[in-house]
Design a protein with these regions (language model features):
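Non-catalytic regulatory/gating segments with a bias toward low-complexity or hydrophobic composition
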Residues: 1-2, 22-25
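Short, glycine-/polar-rich solvent-exposed loops and beta-turns at beta-strand/coil boundaries
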Residues: 14-19, 136-139, 173, 428-433
């Protein structure tokens, strides 16, 4: 695994690398040698650690009593154990109920057969994980073939073929009313997993008629609308299966002339997913759901990529090494899906949980893409006597999702290095084996903020009613209509990152100690984001994507590793790294009406605090904008004495309230 972080290294990979760098992964290949069969297996267990320890029933009652007393309110009857003794007895540790020890296993089998002219490798892997939450699992099957065939001394054909099948039953953990873990936090400890009267799932309190008759109520309102988490885990019938196929076919023609090689590669991938989730009626006390539903969707993704590359590498007079590359690439992506929701099933038996038994159904089809890109790539490299190194590259990308007049971008890069340790004046020694300084500059394009459907997202279909609020049609209601979903920007262009990097590489003590030091300065400009300023809500559609703003990231990275042998059979390797980065918005790109720099706002708010994160010029990206506090008031007297400019700024504050500054 190789990670390319600097823009000069990543530039040749284009917009697919985005602004974050490139990760290169080399997998196991077929090789020459006698036929071999290998097998390895791994077994283990998983447990969730550092779980929240919930209060027991007695502690919950005490907490409620204290909170109502501190607020000067009377205790509700549901939390008064003299009126509702049920609430004071612990019956369930909900965290213990929903979590378990999960068993996992891994199996890998590989067969390798190879000669001088051909090699084949076939492998099969099976992974299975029991989830740490009840009734969850994850299962993978992977079949892979890798073959290489040398037809003659010039022509080689290779094939990589992978089939993967993934099945899982995962669950939501933190959403209201459907998240099992958050439901376990809210469910009272006095409740039971199952109703002792009939074995159905228990609610927040008892449903025993004798108890209700004796105490006049089961006080269900005391616990709000909590949901039994075990019902969420066990009763919902989930099914999620994904099958994927990747194929890469390569043709290589070597030594067309000495040092010149041509490589053509075609990759195709196909992915299909089928998801099904049946949600039964939830009738226990707490948060009932009196209708059932079935969500079923499937999609198919097709993608292909072709690459044709000429490379030239040669050394002249044992000192001059020259390398050149020219490549063209093209890729295409499309995804088509169908989602059908059914509800009002008369019978919830598992063999009847199909859409044909639903009382009503609603269907949605969707298309992502098609998206296409074409690129031209060139690179020249020169080194002299393994001391001086210079590399220059250029890439032109054409992106189908950008407007026609701005759909291409040019991204150059330069790298220079000096291996000082190979100079004649550098003394031979056993301490410093390599000393190399390097510098690089490069630009990389990024389209990650633009969806595949950007240019085709003008029209959307509504499946709900909408009433006009403005204009001559005000008050009119439309059903199932087509409308403009987003405004397109004909001037949208590439988001671009430009980066400088200065580095030192140092190997010491017979190459056992390796040190790499880097300083970088990265400027990202023409950021692609939704326009949030000067976009009236009365337009009725989402803000258009625009290029605005500039972000600077400066920092330092240090990596250090040590490797050594204990004897001929044993060795060890230790590594560590340190990094420091400073991020700020150097240009916000928009101005207020008074000419001052504007602000980018995030989406929505939290508990009546609007736009809890914002981006302002001179500040880090997406900074939190919250109300500052200085602890809590320790007494009513302290709250009454808390003033600013002679006035109380929190006139209703009492002991225990937050102190705002």
């Amino acid at each position: 695994i190789v990670v390319l972080k600097d823009a000069a290294s990543a530039a040749i990979y284009g917009a697919q690398s985005g602004a974050g760098g490139v990760v290169l992964v080399t997998t196991k290949k077929a090789k020459e040698g006698a036929p071999s069969l290998s097998y390895d297996a791994t077994f283990g267990i998983r447990q969730a650690m550092n779980l929240i320890e919930p209060l027991n029933a007695e502690e919950q009652v005490k907490m409620r009593q204290l909170s109502y007393a501190n607020a000067g309110l009377s205790l509700p009857a549901g939390w008064d154990t003299s009126k509702n003794p049920w609430v004071g007895t612990t019956r369930t540790d909900w965290m213990d109920e929903i979590f378990r020890t999960g068993f996992y296993q891994r199996h890998n089998v590989a067969l390798n057969v190879g000669t001088e002219n051909y090699s084949n490798r076939l492998s099969f892997a099976f992974d299975q994980d029991e989830g740490v939450l009840e009734n969850t699992f994850d299962k993978h099957f992977t079949l892979r073939y890798n073959g290489k065939f040398k037809l003659n001394k010039w022509v080689t054909i290779s094939e990589d073929l992978i089939w993967k099948n993934h099945e899982d039953r995962s669950v939501d953990t933190n959403s209201g009313y459907t998240g099992a873990v958050i439901a376990a936090m809210f469910m009272p400890a006095s409740a039971t997993v199952y109703n002792p009267l009939d074995g159905t799932y228990g609610g927040t309190t008892t449903e025993d008629p004798a108890y209700i008759a004796q105490y006049g109520s089961n006080f269900a309102d005391a616990h709000g609308d909590a949901v039994n988490p075990m019902r969420l885990l066990e009763a919902h019938n989930r099914y999620d299966k994904t099958s994927e196929v990747w194929s890469t076919t390569s043709l290589e023609i070597a030594n067309i002339v000495p040092g010149l090689k041509f490589t053509s590669r075609f990759t195709y991938s196909l992915e299909h997913q089928n998801y099904k989730n049946f949600s039964p009626i939830r009738d226990e006390v707490g948060k009932p759901e009196l209708s059932n539903s079935l969500n079923n969707y499937s999609y198919r993704t097709d993608a292909w990529k072709t690459e044709n590359t000429l490379t030239y590498d040669n050394t002249f007079n044992d000192k001059h090494t020259v390398g050149a590359l020219f490549s063209t690439t093209a890729d295409h992506y499309a995804m088509r899906g169908l989602e059908v929701d059914g509800k009002d099933f008369a019978d919830e038996s598992s063999y009847l949980q199909y859409l044909s038994y639903a009382g009503s159904t609603t269907a949605y089809d969707f298309l992502t893409g098609p998206d296409a890109n074409v690129s031209l790539i060139g690179r020249l490299a020169y080194s002299y006597d393994d001391r001086y190194f210079l590399t220059a590259s250029w890439r032109r990308d054409y992106a189908g999702r950008l407007p026609k007049d701005n759909n291409y971008g040019d991204f150059p890069a330069l790298t220079a290095a000096w291996k000082i340790s190979n100079e004649a004046f550098f003394p031979e020694n056993d301490v410093v084996n390599l000393l190399k300084v390097r510098a690089s500059w490069g630009r990389v394009g990024n389209l990650g903020s633009i969806g595949y459907n950007y240019k085709s997202a003008v029209l959307k279909k509504s499946s709900w009613s909408e009433q006009a609020q403005y204009g001559p049609e005000s008050g009119k209601v439309w059903e199932n209509f087509v409308y403009n979903g987003v405004a397109l920007n004909p001037n949208l262009t590439w988001e671009t990152s430009e980066q400088w990097d200065l580095g030192i590489d140092l190997d010491m003590f017979n190459n056992r100690l390796n040190v790499a030091l880097d300083y970088f300065d990265k400027r990202t400009f023409n950021l692609i984001q939704e326009q949030t300023m000067n976009w009236p809500n009365t337009i009725g559609i989402s803000g258009m994507l625009v290029n605005q703003g500039e972000i600077r990231n400066r920092g330092f990275e240090a990596q250090m590793s040590w490797k050594d042998k204990i004897n001929k059979d044993w060795s060890y390797f230790v590594s560590g790294n340190f990094s420091y980065i400073k991020n700020k918005v150097s240009d916000i790109g928009v101005k207020n009406q008074d000419g001052t720099p504007g602000v980018w706002t995030g989406e929505g708010g939290f508990r009546n605090i609007p736009y809890i994160y914002q981006t302002a010029q001179g500040q880090p990206l997406n900074s939190f904008y919250l109300i500052k506090t200085d602890g809590i008031f320790q007494s009513d007297a302290e709250a009454a004495a808390y003033v600013k400019d002679g006035k109380r700024i929190q006139p209703d504050a009492v002991a225990g309230d937050l102190k705002f500054v």
